[in-house]
């Protein structure tokens, strides 16, 4: 296995003078698993409990010392300490319709969500009172551990489960974290793709997952190449009716390789791109290819990516009980997985069962597609924007029309 050794630097969307390092959080299977897939290196946000005004009176000498310290920190560590009240990403929950579903009493109860990532730091205050199932393919620990260089798994779990500051999308789901990626000696998060495949099967066979959330991915194999292990595992579980939500990838722009990440390229997977708080597609969100292969085109509702969700400057739980801001399709993936959990709570007949064959996935994906269009208007798909922006409440309404599947 060749490890990814190059780190790219990208300007922050709202502040081009601040440069962030790309988050190296996905395995390097045969040079195809990209660190870019999971997003940028988060910028740490230090909370202050009480601040009456966003400015302070200090002497000139102290001001110069503070300014000098900040410049050194930004240059050395590529993160910026923000001495303001702890911000949130409430817009992401409100604009996506998630808070509307939560107002109906939905919180994910009874739905099994399995996340494959770097592990989790369950000591963060965002998870107070939470119990989870933990499977460790990295170190064999029986207790929850975070192996990520920047606590990537903790960040993703916080979006879904947070119990404080910013309530997660589906905070009461039955949750499992499967650790398959870890920080290496170079400070990067890497892993073996075969472990990702094993984790996907564990989510199915041991945890009985309804939803598998994958904020990771790699490059789609070229025509004629053997199907990868993670793609095979993903295809197997989706054909059994288990929902898989995966990141589209973060290589959008002039260097885009022309398709979403793998295993997000599997037809029945819900593949997610990112948009900002104004509903604009994030420039680094990966585009999809209209073709499955040289002889077959993708069909509705499986065009890639399927949907955009909030993914720019999202606040979530991080290492050392701090809160971080991150951007990328990793974040967006969790918003869609959590929204789906709320829908499955309300309509449990759509959950996988022993005789499921994937038809309910097809129906739910059709509902997702229709939730972005007006009545009697044919769906329109864009290779970067998908069918449109996530509206969890409309998705719920469309899902309510599904009969037996």
Model segments located where?
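Substrate-binding/access-modulating region of protease and related hydrolase catalytic domains
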Residues: 2-8, 182-268, 302, 319-333, ...
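Subtilisin-like peptidase catalytic core
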Residues: 2-15, 47-55, 144-222, 273-276, ...
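Hydrolase catalytic cores
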Residues: 178-182, 311-381
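Extracellular S/T/G-rich loop segment that most often corresponds to the catalytic His/Ser-adjacent loop
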Residues: 117, 261-345
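Hydrophobic membrane-insertion alpha-helices, especially the h-region
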Residues: 59-76
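N-terminal domain-start motif of subtilase-like serine proteases
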Residues: 43-61, 81-114, 138-149, 285, ...
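Subtilisin-like serine protease catalytic core
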Residues: 102-113, 120-133, 144-192, 239, ...
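N-terminal targeting leaders characterized by basic, low-complexity, disordered sequences
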Residues: 1-35
């Amino acid at each position: 296995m060749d490890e990814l050794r190059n780190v790219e630097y990208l300007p922050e969307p709202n502040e081009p003078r601040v440069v962030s390092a790309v988050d190296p959080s996905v395995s390097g299977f045969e040079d195809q698993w990209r660190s870019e897939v999971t997003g940028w290196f988060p910028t740490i946000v230090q909370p202050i409990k009480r601040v009456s005004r966003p400015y302070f009176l200090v002497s000139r000498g102290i001001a110069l010392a503070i300014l000098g310290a900040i410049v050194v920190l930004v240059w050395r560590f590529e993160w910026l300490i923000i001495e303001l009240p702890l911000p949130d990403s409430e817009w992401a929950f409100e604009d996506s319709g998630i808070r509307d579903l939560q107002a109906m009493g939905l919180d994910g109860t009874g739905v099994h969500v399995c996340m494959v990532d770097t592990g989790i730091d369950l000591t963060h205050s965002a998870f107070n009172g939470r119990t989870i199932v933990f499977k460790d393919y990295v170190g064999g620990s029986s207790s929850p551990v975070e192996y990520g260089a920047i606590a990537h798994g903790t960040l993703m779990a916080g979006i879904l489960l947070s119990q404080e500051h910013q309530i997660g999308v589906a905070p009461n789901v039955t949750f499992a974290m499967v650790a398959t990626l870890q920080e290496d000696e170079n400070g990067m998060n890497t892993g073996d793709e075969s472990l990702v495949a094993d984790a996907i099967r564990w989510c199915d066979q041991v945890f009985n997952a309804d939803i598998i959330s994958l904020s990771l991915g790699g490059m789609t194999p070229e025509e004629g190449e053997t199907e990868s292990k993670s793609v095979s595992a993903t295809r197997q579980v989706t054909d059994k009716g288990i929902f898989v939500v995966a990141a589209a990838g973060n290589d959008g722009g002039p260097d885009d390789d022309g398709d979403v990440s793998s295993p997000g390229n599997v037809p029945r997977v819900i593949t997610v791109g990112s948009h900002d708080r104004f509903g604009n597609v994030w420039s680094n969100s990966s585009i999809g290819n209209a073709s499955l292969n040289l002889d077959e085109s993708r069909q509705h509702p499986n065009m890639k990516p399927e949907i955009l969700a909030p993914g720019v400057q999202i606040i979530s739980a991080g290492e050392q009980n701090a809160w971080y801001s991150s951007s990328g399709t990793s974040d967006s993936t969790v918003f869609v997985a959590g929204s789906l959990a709320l829908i499955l709570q309300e309509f449990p007949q759509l959950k996988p069962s022993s005789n499921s064959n994937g038809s309910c996935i097809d129906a739910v994906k059709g509902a997702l597609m229709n939730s972005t269009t007006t009545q009697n208007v044919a769906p329109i798909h864009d290779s970067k924007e998908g069918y449109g922006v996530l509206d969890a409440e409309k998705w719920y309404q469309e899902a309510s029309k599904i009969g037996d599947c």
